[in-house]
C-alpha cells in the first residue's frame, strides 16, 4: 500500500507535505505533486500536513492515481522535491474546484 496525491492538489501544489516525508518520495510537476508508490513506506506522516486533504491512502478507486504517479515520474521526468515552496499563484481560488486533473493536466498533454 502507498499514499496517493489526488485531484485536490492540481493547480494548488501546496508543498507542506514534502518536508515531513521521512523517505523523500514526493515528485513535482508543473501543476501538482505525486508520491512515488515504490518509495512510499505508508507511514501517513504527510496526510495531516496537506492543507487541502489531497493525500489519501491507496484504495481500489484510487489506483488510477497510483498509475499516473508512476507514469509522470518514469515517462515525463518529474523531479524529486524535498523542500517546501510557495503554493501556485491562485491556489486559494482553485482549492475547491472539482475535476481539475481533467481540466488542466489531461487537456495540456
UniProtKB/Swiss-Prot annotation:
Natural source organism: Rickettsia prowazekii (strain Madrid E)
Residues reported to bind [3Fe-4S] cluster: 9, 17, 50
Segments forming a coiled coil: none
Gene: fdxA
GO molecular function, one term: 3 iron, 4 sulfur cluster binding
SUPFAM superfamilies given in the database record: 4Fe-4S ferredoxins
Binding-site residues for [4Fe-4S] cluster, renumbered to this chain: 21, 40, 43, 46
Entry annotated with the keyword 4Fe-4S: yes
Annotated ranges, domain 4Fe-4S ferredoxin-type: 2-30, 31-60
Role according to the record: Ferredoxins are iron-sulfur proteins that transfer electrons in a wide variety of metabolic reactions.
Alphabetical list of Pfam families matching this protein: DUF3470, Fer4
Cofactor note: Binds 1 [4Fe-4S] cluster. Binds 1 [3Fe-4S] cluster.
Cofactor dependence: [4Fe-4S] cluster; [3Fe-4S] cluster
The name this protein goes by in its record: Ferredoxin
This protein's UniProt keywords: 3Fe-4S, 4Fe-4S, Electron transport, Iron, Iron-sulfur, Metal-binding, Repeat, Transport
